[in-house]
Amino acid sequence: MTETKYSAVIIAKNDESTIGECILAMQKLTNDILIVLDDRSDDNTENICLQHGVRLIKKTWEGYSGNKNFGADHGKNDWILCPDADEVFDDVLIQKLKEINPKDDQVYEMNRLTYFMKTAVKHSGWFPDWNIRLYNKKSMRWNDNLVHESLESTYPLRRQRLSGIVRHYSFRDENHMKEKYDIYAKLRANEWIKANKRPSIFKMWFGPYFRFVRTFILKLGFLDGKTGYTIAKNDFILKRKEIYYWRQFPKSASNVQ
C-alpha cells in the first residue's frame, strides 16, 4: 500500500460495463473508494459497486463538477484520485502512484488512451491526452463548467506527469458515441447561454467542416483508418448539434439534466 493515503472518488451513472474494472484498479491504491452514483442510474452499477465493498452515495445530479466536489468533500483523505467510471489505471501507473510522495503545490497528470469499441485510438487528437487524476482537495476544486469541467486553484500549482496509461473505455460502439455526443452538444449550448455568448458566424457556418479536417487530417485521424473517419464524422455532427441546440434552446435556464 502506498505511503501517501489516497481517496478515490468516482462519479457514475449506468456504468455497469466498466465500473468493476475501475474499482479493482483503485483497490490496489486505497481502501477509501467512494462512488457518487447519479440517482437516475437504472442498470446494475449499484450492485456491482456494493459487491466490491466500496462506499456508495446515491445523489441527485448537480452536474459533473457539483458531484465531483461533493465526492471529494466526503473523501477521508486530502489526496483525491479521480478516475472516470470508464477509466482503468494500468499497472505501471499504479506502481508509480505507490512510489511518489505528492507535493502540496503540485497536481498530477496521467496519460489517457481512449478505446473506440476495442480499438486503441492513437491519433485523431485523442492521444496523448494528459488529464489531472490526482489532486489535493485542500488546494483545488472543480469549476462549474457544464462540459469539460476542470480543476481550479486560488494559487499557481505545478503540473507533474506520471508514467503509465489510463485506459479509457469511452465508447462501446458508434451509437453509444452519438448518444454521448448529443449530451455534450446540449451541455455546450447551455454553457454558451449561461455565459451569454453567441457563436461567431465563422463557427456557425464553418466550424463543423474545420473540426472534421482538424480531426481527420491535421490530427492524423486517417492513420486510425475507419475508426479515424468515424471519429471525424461524429466530430462534424457534434459541432453542428452544438449550433442547433444553441438556436433551439431558450436563452435562459439550463435545458439539460
For the regions a language model picked out, list residue spans one by one.
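Conserved donor nucleotide-binding strand/loop of the catalytic core
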Residues: 31, 46-76
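Catalytic metal- and UDP-sugar-binding loop of GT-A-like glycosyltransferases, i.e.
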Residues: 59, 83-85
